[in-house]
Design a protein with these regions (language model features):
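Bacterial Sec-dependent N-terminal signal peptides
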Residues: 1-26
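Short, solvent-exposed aromatic-acidic interface loops
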Residues: 76-82, 149-154, 208-213
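Hydrophobic N-terminal alpha-helices or hydrophobic patches in metabolic proteins across all domains
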Residues: 94, 232-234
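Domain-core and long-helix interface of multi-subunit machines
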Residues: 171-232
Length: 235
Protein backbone atom coordinates (compact mmCIF):
# COMPACT_ATOMS: atom_id res chain seq x y z
CA UNK A 1 0.00 0.00 0.00
CA UNK A 2 1.39 3.39 -1.01
CA UNK A 3 1.72 6.29 1.40
CA UNK A 4 -0.33 9.40 0.82
CA UNK A 5 0.56 13.00 0.06
CA UNK A 6 -2.25 15.55 0.15
CA UNK A 7 -2.92 19.01 -1.25
CA UNK A 8 -4.84 20.90 1.41
CA UNK A 9 -7.62 23.02 0.01
CA UNK A 10 -7.04 26.38 1.61
CA UNK A 11 -4.46 29.17 1.24
CA UNK A 12 -4.35 32.79 2.42
CA UNK A 13 -2.33 35.53 0.68
CA UNK A 14 -0.94 38.84 1.92
CA UNK A 15 0.47 41.72 -0.14
CA UNK A 16 3.93 43.29 -0.42
CA UNK A 17 5.88 45.13 -3.19
CA UNK A 18 6.96 43.92 -6.64
CA UNK A 19 10.34 43.63 -8.35
CA UNK A 20 11.76 41.92 -11.43
CA UNK A 21 13.78 38.70 -11.48
CA UNK A 22 17.43 38.96 -12.55
CA UNK A 23 20.48 36.84 -13.39
CA UNK A 24 21.61 37.43 -9.80
CA UNK A 25 18.38 35.80 -8.60
CA UNK A 26 19.06 32.74 -10.76
CA UNK A 27 22.58 32.47 -9.35
CA UNK A 28 21.29 32.91 -5.79
CA UNK A 29 18.86 30.01 -6.21
CA UNK A 30 21.46 27.73 -7.81
CA UNK A 31 24.19 28.54 -5.28
CA UNK A 32 21.93 28.58 -2.21
CA UNK A 33 22.88 26.61 0.88
CA UNK A 34 19.84 24.33 0.96
CA UNK A 35 19.18 22.50 4.22
CA UNK A 36 18.21 19.02 2.98
CA UNK A 37 16.22 16.52 5.04
CA UNK A 38 15.16 13.07 3.86
CA UNK A 39 11.67 12.50 5.28
CA UNK A 40 11.05 9.07 3.77
CA UNK A 41 12.13 7.14 0.72
CA UNK A 42 11.46 9.37 -2.28
CA UNK A 43 10.68 12.50 -0.23
CA UNK A 44 13.26 15.27 0.30
CA UNK A 45 12.65 18.57 2.06
CA UNK A 46 14.88 21.50 1.08
CA UNK A 47 14.88 24.84 2.86
CA UNK A 48 16.92 27.99 2.20
CA UNK A 49 17.13 31.53 3.53
CA UNK A 50 18.13 34.44 1.29
CA UNK A 51 19.29 37.87 2.42
CA UNK A 52 18.18 39.20 -0.96
CA UNK A 53 16.16 37.30 -3.54
CA UNK A 54 13.96 39.34 -5.90
CA UNK A 55 15.09 42.39 -3.96
CA UNK A 56 14.01 41.32 -0.47
CA UNK A 57 14.77 38.66 2.18
CA UNK A 58 13.15 35.30 1.44
CA UNK A 59 12.52 31.94 3.06
CA UNK A 60 11.83 29.13 0.58
CA UNK A 61 10.87 25.50 1.23
CA UNK A 62 10.73 22.81 -1.45
CA UNK A 63 9.35 19.31 -0.95
CA UNK A 64 10.57 16.94 -3.68
CA UNK A 65 8.48 13.80 -4.21
CA UNK A 66 9.20 10.76 -6.34
CA UNK A 67 5.61 9.96 -7.41
CA UNK A 68 6.02 6.22 -7.98
CA UNK A 69 6.20 5.74 -4.20
CA UNK A 70 3.19 7.85 -3.22
CA UNK A 71 -0.46 8.60 -3.94
CA UNK A 72 -1.69 12.19 -4.01
CA UNK A 73 -5.09 13.42 -2.90
CA UNK A 74 -7.00 16.60 -2.02
CA UNK A 75 -8.13 16.95 1.58
CA UNK A 76 -10.97 19.32 2.48
CA UNK A 77 -10.49 20.63 6.00
CA UNK A 78 -11.70 23.40 8.29
CA UNK A 79 -10.04 26.80 7.67
CA UNK A 80 -8.94 27.16 11.30
CA UNK A 81 -7.32 23.73 11.37
CA UNK A 82 -3.56 24.00 10.96
CA UNK A 83 -2.05 22.38 7.89
CA UNK A 84 0.18 20.10 9.97
CA UNK A 85 -2.76 18.96 12.11
CA UNK A 86 -4.96 18.20 9.09
CA UNK A 87 -2.13 16.31 7.39
CA UNK A 88 -1.48 14.20 10.49
CA UNK A 89 -5.20 13.47 10.91
CA UNK A 90 -5.46 12.23 7.32
CA UNK A 91 -2.40 9.99 7.57
CA UNK A 92 -0.44 12.01 4.99
CA UNK A 93 3.34 12.20 5.13
CA UNK A 94 3.33 15.71 3.61
CA UNK A 95 0.88 18.44 2.64
CA UNK A 96 0.73 21.91 1.13
CA UNK A 97 -1.97 24.57 0.87
CA UNK A 98 -3.67 24.12 -2.47
CA UNK A 99 -6.18 26.85 -3.40
CA UNK A 100 -8.17 29.85 -2.14
CA UNK A 101 -11.04 30.15 0.32
CA UNK A 102 -13.58 32.57 1.76
CA UNK A 103 -12.19 33.56 5.15
CA UNK A 104 -15.64 34.21 6.66
CA UNK A 105 -17.65 31.29 5.25
CA UNK A 106 -14.75 28.84 5.05
CA UNK A 107 -15.68 27.44 1.64
CA UNK A 108 -13.45 27.23 -1.43
CA UNK A 109 -13.77 30.06 -3.94
CA UNK A 110 -12.37 27.78 -6.66
CA UNK A 111 -13.99 24.85 -8.43
CA UNK A 112 -13.64 21.56 -6.57
CA UNK A 113 -15.11 18.33 -7.89
CA UNK A 114 -14.50 15.02 -6.13
CA UNK A 115 -15.73 11.71 -7.57
CA UNK A 116 -18.49 13.35 -9.60
CA UNK A 117 -19.71 15.66 -6.82
CA UNK A 118 -19.25 19.43 -7.19
CA UNK A 119 -18.15 20.69 -3.77
CA UNK A 120 -17.58 24.33 -4.76
CA UNK A 121 -17.54 26.54 -7.87
CA UNK A 122 -15.17 29.34 -8.90
CA UNK A 123 -16.20 32.75 -7.61
CA UNK A 124 -16.21 35.91 -9.68
CA UNK A 125 -13.76 38.72 -8.98
CA UNK A 126 -9.97 38.92 -8.76
CA UNK A 127 -9.42 35.32 -7.68
CA UNK A 128 -11.73 34.15 -10.46
CA UNK A 129 -9.47 35.79 -13.05
CA UNK A 130 -6.33 34.08 -11.76
CA UNK A 131 -7.91 30.62 -11.40
CA UNK A 132 -6.92 29.42 -14.86
CA UNK A 133 -5.32 26.10 -13.96
CA UNK A 134 -6.37 22.87 -12.30
CA UNK A 135 -4.90 19.90 -10.50
CA UNK A 136 -6.46 16.65 -11.67
CA UNK A 137 -5.86 13.59 -9.49
CA UNK A 138 -7.06 10.09 -10.30
CA UNK A 139 -5.92 6.91 -8.56
CA UNK A 140 -3.20 8.89 -6.81
CA UNK A 141 -1.65 10.23 -10.04
CA UNK A 142 -1.59 13.96 -10.75
CA UNK A 143 -1.77 16.17 -13.85
CA UNK A 144 -1.78 19.95 -14.20
CA UNK A 145 -4.30 21.33 -16.71
CA UNK A 146 -5.33 24.68 -18.21
CA UNK A 147 -8.78 25.70 -16.98
CA UNK A 148 -11.54 28.19 -17.77
CA UNK A 149 -15.19 28.87 -16.99
CA UNK A 150 -16.05 26.90 -20.14
CA UNK A 151 -14.24 23.79 -18.86
CA UNK A 152 -15.96 24.24 -15.52
CA UNK A 153 -19.43 24.34 -17.07
CA UNK A 154 -18.69 21.33 -19.27
CA UNK A 155 -16.98 19.18 -16.62
CA UNK A 156 -18.77 15.85 -16.14
CA UNK A 157 -15.97 13.77 -14.61
CA UNK A 158 -17.33 10.98 -12.43
CA UNK A 159 -14.02 9.75 -11.03
CA UNK A 160 -11.03 11.52 -9.55
CA UNK A 161 -10.63 15.04 -8.18
CA UNK A 162 -10.37 18.42 -9.91
CA UNK A 163 -9.14 21.38 -7.85
CA UNK A 164 -8.90 24.72 -9.63
CA UNK A 165 -6.36 27.37 -8.65
CA UNK A 166 -3.82 29.57 -10.35
CA UNK A 167 -2.50 31.29 -12.13
CA UNK A 168 -1.06 28.51 -14.26
CA UNK A 169 2.54 29.55 -14.84
CA UNK A 170 4.22 26.87 -17.00
CA UNK A 171 3.06 24.23 -19.47
CA UNK A 172 5.62 22.04 -21.23
CA UNK A 173 8.38 24.39 -20.12
CA UNK A 174 6.80 27.49 -21.66
CA UNK A 175 5.40 30.43 -19.73
CA UNK A 176 1.61 30.70 -19.81
CA UNK A 177 -0.30 33.82 -20.83
CA UNK A 178 -1.46 35.54 -17.64
CA UNK A 179 -2.51 38.83 -19.25
CA UNK A 180 -6.19 38.18 -18.41
CA UNK A 181 -5.39 37.68 -14.72
CA UNK A 182 -5.92 40.42 -12.15
CA UNK A 183 -2.66 42.36 -12.48
CA UNK A 184 -2.58 43.60 -8.91
CA UNK A 185 -2.65 40.00 -7.70
CA UNK A 186 -0.04 38.98 -10.27
CA UNK A 187 2.43 41.81 -9.64
CA UNK A 188 2.16 42.22 -5.87
CA UNK A 189 4.34 40.19 -3.52
CA UNK A 190 2.43 37.56 -1.53
CA UNK A 191 3.29 34.42 0.38
CA UNK A 192 2.90 31.78 -2.36
CA UNK A 193 2.66 28.03 -2.79
CA UNK A 194 3.01 26.14 -6.07
CA UNK A 195 2.68 22.59 -7.34
CA UNK A 196 5.36 21.78 -9.92
CA UNK A 197 6.04 18.87 -12.26
CA UNK A 198 9.73 18.73 -13.18
CA UNK A 199 11.55 17.68 -16.31
CA UNK A 200 12.79 14.55 -14.52
CA UNK A 201 9.21 13.61 -13.48
CA UNK A 202 9.41 14.65 -9.85
CA UNK A 203 6.69 16.60 -8.04
CA UNK A 204 7.64 19.73 -6.12
CA UNK A 205 5.62 21.47 -3.43
CA UNK A 206 7.15 24.97 -3.36
CA UNK A 207 6.35 27.34 -0.49
CA UNK A 208 7.59 30.93 -0.31
CA UNK A 209 6.91 32.48 3.07
CA UNK A 210 5.76 36.06 3.61
CA UNK A 211 4.25 38.50 6.08
CA UNK A 212 7.61 38.78 7.89
CA UNK A 213 9.25 42.13 7.14
CA UNK A 214 13.01 41.82 6.92
CA UNK A 215 12.93 38.01 6.99
CA UNK A 216 10.50 36.64 4.39
CA UNK A 217 8.58 39.08 2.20
CA UNK A 218 7.06 36.89 -0.53
CA UNK A 219 7.12 36.97 -4.33
CA UNK A 220 4.93 38.00 -7.24
CA UNK A 221 3.86 35.63 -10.03
CA UNK A 222 6.66 36.45 -12.54
CA UNK A 223 9.18 35.88 -9.73
CA UNK A 224 7.56 32.60 -8.73
CA UNK A 225 7.52 31.50 -12.38
CA UNK A 226 11.22 32.28 -12.64
CA UNK A 227 11.90 30.36 -9.41
CA UNK A 228 10.15 27.17 -10.49
CA UNK A 229 11.92 27.24 -13.86
CA UNK A 230 15.31 27.49 -12.13
CA UNK A 231 14.24 24.60 -9.88
CA UNK A 232 13.64 22.44 -12.97
CA UNK A 233 9.91 22.94 -13.44
CA UNK A 234 8.16 21.89 -16.65
CA UNK A 235 4.50 22.39 -15.61
Amino acid sequence: MKNKVVLLLFIVCSAWTATAQTVADSLALVAAHWQVTSLKKGVLCRKAFFNSLYGVPQEVSVLEITPKYYNLDVLIHQPKEETSVAAHRSGAIAAVNGSYFNMKAGNSVCYLRKNGVVVDTTANGALGTVSNGAVFIKKGRMKLLPWSKQEEKACRLKHGTVLVSGPLMLMNGKECDISACNQSFVNTKHPRSAIVLTKDKKILFVVVDGRMKGKAEGVNIPELTHMIRVLGGKD
